[in-house]
């Protein structure tokens, strides 16, 4: 059996190529500890961020997730109610509550001056997390549409041996 996940590669390409957001030496806060986060932590570690912190409603799940990547960088975990006072450069939302009408009022004690917020969820309207982020001083925000497109291109490359161009697809879908 051969299996691939394109969550990490799709996210990285969207962050770095489409959005121009660097993550090397960044403090990254991940909200949620589900399957999508499992798929992206490894890829984020490869970019050598300063730190990655996973915060989840169920604290034990956050710790279980970072244990999978021990020795891959500075990884810490907590509940959503105990996020460290670190100047977060990038906050990535993977909470299932983001699919609902509102986003939970999570206290993020410190943001970097140029903090960015990224929602793994995508929509033709601002997601609940993007609206929440806009109201809390994030300088840049994006939903996960670019990640979805980049994942599709990576999957196509796995099956067909060549990676299709994605910039035009993303531009068309954003208009």
Can you describe what each PLM-predicted range is?
Residues 1-26:
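Glycine/small-residue-rich loop that forms an oxyanion/phosphate-binding "nest" at active or ligand-binding sites
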Residues 8, 102, 107, 115-166, ...:
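Rossmann-fold NAD(P)-binding glycine/threonine-rich loop
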Residues 21-27, 48, 112-113:
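Short helix-loop-beta connector
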Residues 32-34:
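Glycine-rich Rossmann-fold phosphate-binding loop(s) that bind the pyrophosphate
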Residues 37-38, 126:
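N-terminal Rossmann-fold NAD(P) dinucleotide-binding loop
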Residues 45-51, 135-140:
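Conserved S-adenosyl-L-methionine
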Residues 47-69:
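NAD(P)-binding Rossmann-fold cofactor-contacting core
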Residues 58, 82-104, 118:
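Rossmann-like NAD(P)-binding element
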């Amino acid at each position: 059996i051969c299996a691939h996940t394109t969550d990490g590669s799709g996210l990285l390409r969207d962050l770095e190529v489409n959005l121009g957001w660097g993550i090397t030496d960044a403090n990254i806060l991940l909200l949620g500890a589900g399957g999508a986060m499992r798929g992206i932590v490894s890829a984020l570690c490869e970019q050598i961020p300063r730190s990655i912190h996973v915060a989840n409603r169920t604290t034990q799940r956050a710790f279980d997730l970072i244990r999978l990547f021990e020795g891959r960088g500075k990884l810490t975990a907590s509940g959503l109610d105990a996020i460290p006072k670190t100047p977060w450069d990038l906050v990535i939302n993977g909470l299932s509550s983001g699919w609902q009408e509102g986003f939970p009022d999570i206290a993020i004690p410190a943001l970097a001056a140029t903090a960015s917020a990224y929602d793994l969820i995508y929509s033709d309207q601002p997601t609940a997390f993007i609206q929440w982020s806009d109201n809390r001083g994030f300088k840049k925000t994006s939903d996960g549409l670019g990640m979805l497109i980049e994942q599709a291109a990576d999957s196509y490359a796995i099956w067909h041996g060549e990676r299709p161009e994605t910039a035009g697809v993303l531009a068309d879908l954003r208009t």
